[in-house]
Regions:
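Preference for the N-terminal adenyl/adenosyl cofactor-binding alpha/beta module
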Residues: 1-312
Length: 312
């Protein structure tokens, strides 16, 4: 895993996505005066420069976006949308490489990639029409709407939103289906040479995804600039700065070390007959001073809790 590459990619991508989403959010006349007209089901919002055309669904999402901006402020909503799309697309990339995407009604994989193609063509596999009309693909795909869209970037955004909505029912922590105001801020031109998806595919080789740790490292590097600024300027932090200086990614070996020398040691000491088979599997256990207890403990009865103060 090339951590220097991941760091550079995460920092540059955050800057680029932030600019694009800031431009996108302002295109919805969030803080501008405009004239609104409605013809049939279509809404037209016009200022002195251009006209924004919205279908009823997007008109509703725009109102939700305005409510969110009024509640949190423009800057925080931009940060929220930027991270959400960064996080979603990184997760999709990891899952498609490992064939984890639950795209059927039974949440099983179809072996179809969403962001890329195994034959290295620039169009993602899911956009091939035979895949879109696959009866096992459980997304709310509308052929007529797809055909009406102007270019591959618009078609891809349409399909990507459908996939995220599907995954929101399976992995709501990442693909929350209740973020309509963020959905309309999906970045444009994702498949272009300088688009986030294209750069993700072309700049980070697939072998970097062999370990799930890549997601943790990208998350840490995504926050690197804010973390460095906060730590360099003060000893006391504002509420919004605390995550940057406290939420650090824990590498896999540290997690294993902590578990093997806490829960693992406790279990071995209370189950002496399990010592040999378990000890051969534990790579990080400190074997000195293991004191066996007379009573056995059922592993299912052990509560393992991590909190802010300690690991029990």
């Amino acid at each position: 895993m090339d951590k220097n590459l991941l760091k550079r990619f995460a920092i540059e991508s955050k800057k680029d996505l932030t600019k694009k989403i800031e431009t996108k959010i302002k295109s919805f006349f969030i803080d501008e005066k405009f004239e609104e007209t409605q013809i049939g089901d279509i809404y037209y919002l016009t200022n002195n420069v251009h006209t924004l055309t919205l279908i009823p669904e997007d008109y509703k999402k725009r109102k939700l976006l305005i409510d969110r901006v009024n509640k949190l402020g423009l800057i925080q909503v931009i940060e929220e949308a930027t991270f959400t799309w960064f996080n979603r697309i990184i997760a999709l990339r990891y899952m498609e490489i490992h064939d984890y995407l639950p795209l059927t009604k039974n949440n099983e994989s179809l072996g179809i990639r969403v962001l890329s193609s195994t034959d290295n063509t620039p169009i993602p596999e899911i956009m091939k029409f035979t895949n879109l009309v696959n009866p096992e693909l459980d997304i709310d795909f509308k052929k007529e709407k797809y055909v009406e869209l102007k270019d591959d970037n618009e078609k891809f955004k349409y399909v990507l939103l459908l996939v995220c909505k599907k995954l929101g029912n399976v992995i709501p922590q990442v693909f929350d289906g209740m973020t309509d105001y963020i959905d309309i801020l999906i970045p444009d031109y994702l498949l272009n040479e300088t688009g986030f998806v294209n750069k993700l595919i072309t700049e980070i080789p697939e072998d970097n995804y062999e370990q799930v740790e890549i997601i943790g490292w990208l998350y840490q590097y995504y926050n690197q600039i804010e973390k460095d600024k906060a730590m360099a300027t003060k000893n006391a932090y504002q509420k919004n700065e605390i995550p940057y200086v406290t939420q650090l990614f824990t590498p896999d070996w540290i997690v294993k070390y902590m578990i093997e020398n806490s829960l693992g040691r406790y279990y071995i000491e209370h189950n002496s007959d399990s010592y040999t088979p378990i000890i051969n599997k534990f790579k990080y256990l400190i074997k000195d001073n293991i004191c066996f207890k007379s009573e056995n403990t059922n592993v299912e009865s052990i509560t393992f809790l991590e909190d802010r103060k300690s690991v029990v």
